[in-house]
Amino acid sequence: RQRQMCIRDRHISVSRAKYTIDYPAGFMLVASMNPCPCGYYNHPTKECTCPPGAVQRYMSRISGPLLDRIDLQVEILPVPFDELASAPQGEPSAAIRERVIKARNIQQQRFADEPAVHCNAQMNSRLMATHCVLDKDSMAILKKAMTRYDMSARAYDRILKVARTIADLDNSPSILPHHTCLLYTSP
């Protein structure tokens, strides 16, 4: 419970017999794990050797409330050697860096009058109501996903904040359907 409050509130309280001290605890959590004990669940070419129920037991070692506080959850499949050895494809790192800098500048301007807020991840409900407005199509997509994956209110907030960030990276003043639909690959 203390960990979850630390992640949400970005501070931690340490209590001793006669006093309580608050410490700042803003951080970015980056974590990884295998999809199952053997590492081959959902692998495109290798078969998972885990006995029935092992994958579920393995996944349940991470609490649902903790997973619910991780903004981005991405399954990464192995890359075949031929793709690794070929010339790089996609957007160059320098171009991505420029998009990120522009998005951070957009957020800095957006929250210039909010001393405790520097980026979309730090938005409270009031700021989300102002800056994370969805059009009719985006709301329909979100409603369908929330129902299909039985997502929590915390997941709803997380999706809106990440969609706002994707829109910023796209230099879009509005959150559009394609900014939200990328977020439903993991419930």
Predicted regions and their residues:
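Basic, amphipathic alpha-helical bundle interface domains used for macromolecular binding and assembly
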Residues: 8-186
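Positively charged, low-complexity/disordered segments
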Residues: 2-3, 187
